[in-house]
Regions:
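Alpha/beta enzyme core
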Residues: 44-272, 276-287
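Catalytic machinery of carbohydrate-active enzymes
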Residues: 2-43
């Protein structure tokens, strides 16, 4: 009944054609689970091995949990926090390097007053004391000409992914009610930015997350879906669909439609304003992160 359920059923179906039978070893509750996890936390990961951890988690977990991290102390808290629920180990799998909290922690507004270079330099301090994969919130990624250098710097440090939003102009935090000064990039221009990011990375294990701001800027579901399909075709590895209303209604409607698309990619939710949503609801609706 886990993440391999459908594969198991397919194997059983195929074996029946040959009068075969699947031999299954009973699941063993891992009594040393916490000890193994503790050992893993003490392991040093090289930048290259750390980059690939997010992709591996996507392939093995029902949902990958990230928590924001704006300094080494927060990173250590996220690194060490864990609970054991009926022999099921729960933890945050990764760290979200947020432009909002990076800016707020330095007493500045979330409008790119803290530039990318400064944020990446500060991120190095977090990387020194943590091992979890990092997803870097890069706002709109900056100028297309500068984006390759951002990608190379992040990958060199061992960051696992970058999230780039389809907004242009002066940054305005997506949770603000007034978005009248915010503008959305054209699909064509943003697809070009995604391709630049994909071409700049050294390894395909470094993931490109396309963040869609259609609901934030008052656009409809069709606009969000059109963007998701085009961004997927351009090379995005994951799609982050953002919303600022206090329920997951918008993102669930999006996921229901996008799951049926031939251009489907894993989905990311950021439940800042709809934090009452249950993890199980996100999973059943098709979200992966």
């Amino acid at each position: 009944n886990g993440i391999q359920k459908n594969i198991r059923l397919e194997v059983i179906k195929t074996l029946k054609k040959w009068n075969g039978k699947l031999i299954e070893v009973p699941y063993t509750k891992n009594s040393s689970l916490l000890k193994n996890q503790s050992k893993a936390k003490k392991t040093f990961f090289t930048p290259m091995s750390r980059v690939s951890r997010f992709r591996r988690l996507l392939e093995t977990q029902k949902i990958v949990r990230f928590i924001e991290c704006h300094n080494p102390l927060v990173g250590l808290l996220a690194e060490k926090l864990s609970i054991n629920l009926k022999n099921e180990f729960r933890e945050f799998h990764g760290l979200w390097s947020s432009s909002l909290t990076d800016s707020a922690s330095q007493g500045k507004p979330d409008n790119q007053s803290v530039e990318l270079t400064t944020r990446i330099n500060n991120l190095n301090n977090v990387i020194e004391v943590t091992n979890k994969p990092i997803l870097f919130d890069a706002d709109n990624g900056g100028r297309p000409e500068h984006l390759p250098y951002t990608i190379k710097n992040l990958e060199r440090l061992g960051v696992s992914a970058i999230a780039i939003e389809d907004k242009i102009g002066l940054k305005s935090n997506s949770l603000f009610k007034d978005q009248s000064r915010a503008n959305q990039d054209t699909i064509k221009n943003f697809c070009r930015k995604i391709k630049i990011a994909c071409n700049a990375r050294h390894s395909n294990d470094f993931l490109i997350v396309a963040r869609i701001e259609s609901f934030i800027l008052g656009q409809d579901l069709n606009d969000a879906l059109k963007r998701a399909e085009n961004f997927s075709k351009a090379g995005a590895d994951l799609i982050l669909i953002h919303s600022k209303i206090d329920t997951p209604k918008e993102i669930f409607a999006f996921a229901k439609k996008f799951k049926k698309s031939k251009y489907y990619k894993p989905l990311v939710a950021v439940p800042s304003t709809y934090s009452s949503v249950k993890e199980e609801e996100l999973i059943s609706s098709g979200f992966n992160v």
